[in-house]
Amino acid sequence: MSRQSFSLLKNLRSIASGSKIQTRSVTYMPRPGDGKPRPVTLIPGDGVGPLVTNAVQQVMEAMHAPVYFEPFEVHGDMKSLPEGLLESIKKNKVCLKGGLKTPVGGGVSSLNVNLRKELDLFASLVNCFNLPGLASRHENVDIVVIRENTEGEYAGLEHEVVPGVVESLKVITKFCSERIAKYAFEYAYLNNRKKVTAVHKANIMKLADGLFLESCQEVAKKYPSIAYNEIIVDNCCMQLVARPEQFDVMVTPNLYGNLVANTAAGIAGGTGVMPGGNVGAEYAVFEQGASAGNVGKDTTEEQKNANPVALLLSSAMMLRHLQFPSFADRLETAVKRVIAEGNCRTEDLGGNSTTQEVVDAVIANLD
């Protein structure tokens, strides 16, 4: 072996052992003026919503994030969205939202659904993944559920045909099916995801879910580098419980996505730690990813021990959406450190910490 080759081999061994590894920061080159603080519409919401949105505000202030909030009082039992709310979101383009209670039965429509329709937030995204240090039913879970947000069973087209007989219409359109499929594949492409799975019940609803599947199949042909498969929704739920690691990106019609996202969240670590958001062509609303329990119990509200992790991670997603990647990374890293250390957790994660104690721990772990 020549002296030059020996020297090269020695250097390679040194690098492999870590003695000469030099870290290089990832550079984000902003445009002039990108550091200007951005307004964000804030909906504290119901139940524990004010607790967890306040947690986000405290952390944002501690890290001097270039955002400020415009709060609006909104509650799920209101008959309509309050005046000025939509105008604020349309002006700011971004909203952070706590949970809103949806009354069961009666004549009050869901403000969550109304907000999505008014702003055409056609894609719901929930990221379900294992957090290091947090025990879960399965390992190696990293699933993104992308759900069509504006039609399907949530179209709200119900009426009583005759006394005792109610008809509820499920609406599936080519336009909405294609755009949610395009969004799912685009998301997979931009985030280096390897597979998109379409969830359906086309074996029974042959026309409605058949149209959804047909749209997914057409879009899949335009992304040959991304694997594509299909699964019936009942089998999907069973497979999620048995082998969730097989899933990557899942694209679903409206109702199925709600069920699948909450199931995946429960498997990966609980609804209290899963981030998410709703996005359209112009606007985005970020909130706790999985809807189950997002307004909390009365005792949780009274004891002030609501889990702020999901909304903090959703806020990191929001910061990336606003093109503040370093702030997003700092926030996400701090939250994950607190979870991994295990000393400060709320009751739903097996601890006895208050919301404020978790906030203080996250702030202490900020770089």
Curated annotation (Swiss-Prot):
Record carries keyword Manganese: yes
SMART domains: Iso_dh
Disulfide cross-links: none
InterPro entries (alphabetical): Isocitrate_DH_NAD, IsoPropMal-DH-like_dom
GO MF entry, a single one: isocitrate dehydrogenase (NAD+) activity
Pfam families: Iso_dh
Keyword Metal-binding: yes
Tissue-specific expression: Ubiquitous. Predominantly expressed in roots, stems and leaves.
Gene Ontology CC entries for this record: mitochondrion
Keyword entries, A-Z: Magnesium, Manganese, Metal-binding, Mitochondrion, NAD, Oxidoreductase, Transit peptide, Tricarboxylic acid cycle
Location(s) in or outside the cell: Mitochondrion
Organelle transit peptide residues: 1-25
Chief location bin: mitochondrion
Gene Ontology biological-process entries: tricarboxylic acid cycle
Function statement: Performs an essential role in the oxidative function of the citric acid cycle.
Subunit structure: Heterooligomer of catalytic and regulatory subunits.
NCBIfam families attached to this UniProt entry: mito_nad_idh
Homology family: Belongs to the isocitrate and isopropylmalate dehydrogenases family.
Name of this protein: Isocitrate dehydrogenase [NAD] regulatory subunit 2, mitochondrial
